[in-house]
Amino acid sequence: MHKVFISPSDQRRNTYASGNTNEAEVCGRIGAACRAALERCGFAVELVQYEPMSSKCAKSDAFGAELHLPIHTNAFNGKTSGTRIMCYALSGEGYKAAKAIFDVLAPLTPGTSENITAHPELYEIKNANAPTAYVEVDFHDVPEVAAWLTANTETIGETIAKGVCKYFGEAYIPACGNKADEPIAQPTRVGAWSAEARAWAIETGLINGIGQLDDGTPNYAWEAHVTREQLVTILHRFAQGIKREESSWSM
């Protein structure tokens, strides 16, 4: 079982250009999503956020991490944006891990100023025993990018996990819809619309569920992502339903 140590930013003072949030809050959510994805894929994961970098490196070493993974967001001039990943040198295991993550994360993020660079002087890169891929997801001082980062923490975490799986040569296992995936934290109108839409889709037969739950009943939980095949199937069922209704009206 491969071991990954996740070190999300603890920089609460780095406020976002939109969304009334900060780097620590968003990166904590990204790190948690990444941990959940990696554990689902069979990795042993330790995550430490609100401790000094020296403590993080010591715990990473004690854990026996095979990859040290700081997760941050960046800032510069309010205009530049894109994924930046840093490692010890542009060769070796740290670079391989950085490249594997970069290859899946950079196409996802909004920005285009993207690269992998060597920064052996950075504390966690220099002091952690494990190869380190230091991820700067994108730039939070650009308002539209800040909004995107805040809205997509789960997808970002999953994507970083995909890159880690690629680096270790392990299969990435996508999340399966289940009841635990979909708690509604607050009774918002959006949540109510979602529940109404699900009930309607089940009643009309637009969705047939994703496998079965432990009790044998269909699993109607929402999934994080919908494939094109699933979307077209749902639209086809909807169109067929309209045709049936139109036929009944003409009779």
Language model features with spans:
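Active-site-proximal helix/loop segments of hydrolytic enzymes
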Residues: 2-5, 11-15, 21-179
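Short, solvent-exposed alpha-helical surface patches in non-cytosolic proteins
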Residues: 179-251
